[in-house]
Swiss-Prot record:
Protein name: Neuraminidase
Annotated segments matching region Head of neuraminidase: 71-449
Function: Catalyzes the removal of terminal sialic acid residues from viral and cellular glycoconjugates. Cleaves off the terminal sialic acids on the glycosylated HA during virus budding to facilitate virus release. Additionally helps virus spread through the circulation by further removing sialic acids from the cell surface. These cleavages prevent self-aggregation and ensure the efficient spread of the progeny virus from cell to cell. Otherwise, infection would be limited to one round of replication.
Gene Ontology CC entries for this record: host cell plasma membrane; membrane; virion membrane
GO biological process: carbohydrate metabolic process; viral budding from plasma membrane
The organism of origin for this protein: Influenza A virus (strain A/Chicken/Pennsylvania/1370/1983 H5N2)
Span list, region Hypervariable stalk region: 36-68
Glycosylation sites: 32, 48, 66, 123, 126, 180, 214, 382
Topology relative to the membrane: Single-pass type II membrane protein
Top-level taxon: Viruses
The UniProt record lists the keyword Membrane: yes
Amino acid sequence: MNPNQKIITIGSVSLTIATVCFLMQIAILATNVTLHFRQNERSIPAYNQTTPCKPIIIERNIKYRNWSKPQCQITGFAPFSKDNSIRLSAGGGIWVTREPYVSCDPSKCYQFALGQGTTLDNNHSNGTIHDRTPHRTLLMNELGVPFHLGTRQVCIAWSSSSCHDGKAWLHVCVTGDDRNATASFIYNGMLVDSIGSWSQNILRTQESECVCINGTCTVVMTDGSASGKADIRILFIREGKIVHISPLSGSAQHIEECSCYPRYPNVRCVCRDNWKGSNRPVIDINMADYSIDSSYVCSGLVGDTPRNDDSSSSSNCRDPNNERGNPGVKGWAFDIGDDVWMGRTISKDSRSGYETFRVIGGWATANSKSQTNRQVIVDNNNWSGYSGIFSVESKSCINRCFYVELIRGRPQETRVWWTSNSIVVFCGTSGTYGTGSWPDGANINFMPL
């Protein structure tokens, strides 16, 4: 071959090889595309199906409350909340209430009260001085929110108690005939249990928060005479179900309207003796074995109303003092070592004014009367009413707080036909504080009749 022929031959062979390679690449590409579409056809459903979207449930590690932290060391009480319900009622749309209280879940506090089934600017408010009607319901709002028309009615009740066990709310709601009332136990929004009157004489309960420790809640209930011997029982409830009932034991003679607080691992209550004593009875509740003991606050500066003058009042820690025991008013106190913090009306005769103070040795020494850290909450020219305790868990300790019911209308203010209240709330503080007075503040002449 001459050189030109060699060049032509090499070029032809190269072109042939290149063509074959090109065709092979096309074949490979076609094969891949075919396989890809066949694979997709197998994975696509034959019909236009939809896959349901299931919610992802994230379970929080919710635990029962045990209140095992120590009690906060306080110097006194600082203002926390005031709802101004009566002043706001002058403009209408606020419930008529009484028997208010405060209780908290692990993250937020709520105010409760027993509504009268009417607003204040409504003719149905006439006669709401009466305690027990079938129209009364337990109201619940976030603390500081007055009971407006959108307020939740938790249950039917003319006597109640509520507490949160760390997982859900328990409400104890008493209603019905005086001689045959029913207490309903509502847990997590559902009716779980009930109990009927055992003495056929106005079954009633605390009108403030119950207490739950490690899932078991306890509440004090009374059935019987308001001015004589009554049948007092302490109920233990778990997730709304009554698991045990203990009778009152110890030296207390009469128990009503207890203000209870956790004293880990047990519960302690300071109550109202409506029969023999103006010194307040104490109930100690053992949450492990359901045993009960009772006595009286040792302080000679007694907490009930009416009462003797401080110079002549007394308490021996064990027995009612037989000093103006009837009728009485709901109140509170709590121990701090051998001392006692307490609140009471300023007037020894009527429900007016409100003060708090610490009595040195008032929990351990009979008739102790050394008072310190006194504060005026409501001056004596203004009406007060019931008061009670509630507990709040902080990062390091258990704080004690209290509320005061500020009653307006009848029986003291006869210009109007209704009876209702607002509240003011204070909590323990380790800081400093000033002075003041926090009455209801409504001008009765501005109010609907």
